[in-house]
Regions:
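A short, polar/charged loop-to-alpha-helix boundary motif
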Residues: 71-85
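Immediate flanking context of iron-sulfur cluster ligation sites
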Residues: 100-113
């Protein structure tokens, strides 16, 4: 009997369906970051994944386009970080392989500085801006290995036209990481 390639199924946790007000305008970085932090916190409280949340917003309207939470352990897939899911779902939502559409810029808001993989995916995603909360040191304090991310990594993204704002509501975002640690969350890439 030969091997078969199994279908790839990716789904968000049930609780996410009602977790975002899709028609609401989130006018500030702080308002957008609260969405990402709330997703991360709920993911921890519900026991559905790691302490990371992300959302993509239409820059012109301030409305959310997509959202993702860390789903690595829940779906047995090492690439299912919050940012990756938000990017994939955002591209699916707008019906294009890139979020860079004429007249429609998008911002990726992540509860933590992206790891090396997510930073790379961001480059190709088409977002024109990244906003982050907790920083690499906060994630590393829990023993998460964020991979080879250097100051030059951010400089490169900026040279490619991606604006970066870091440390928005850092304390609130870092508190979700601490909640995950206190609850005995699995550090899957240590």
């Amino acid at each position: 009997m030969g091997s078969m390639i199994p279908p790839l199924t990716i789904h968000v946790p049930e609780w996410m369906q009602g977790s975002i007000a899709w028609d609401q305008v989130y006018p500030t970085d702080e308002a957008k970051m609260r969405v990402a932090i709330d997703l991360a916190a709920q993911n921890v409280r519900q026991g559905t994944g790691g302490p990371f949340g992300a959302a993509i917003f239409d820059t012109a309207t301030g409305r959310p386009v997509s959202a993702g939470v860390n789903s690595v352990i829940r779906l047995n897939n090492s690439v299912l970080h919050a940012e990756i899911l938000a990017i994939m779902l955002g591209q699916q939502q707008i019906g294009a392989y890139t979020l860079h559409q004429p007249g429609r810029d998008h911002v990726l808001v992540s509860s933590c500085d992206p790891c090396a993989m997510c930073l790379g995916a961001t480059l190709w995603s088409g977002v024109t801006r990244i906003v982050t909360g907790a920083d690499r040191a906060d994630a590393s304090a829990l023993s998460f290995d964020e991979g080879p991310v250097f100051p030059q990594s951010y400089s490169y993204l900026e040279s490619r036209g991606i604006a970066i704002t870091r440390g928005v509501l850092r304390g609130e975002a870092a508190a979700v990481l601490e909640l995950y640690r206190r609850q005995g969350g699995v550090i899957y890439n240590a």
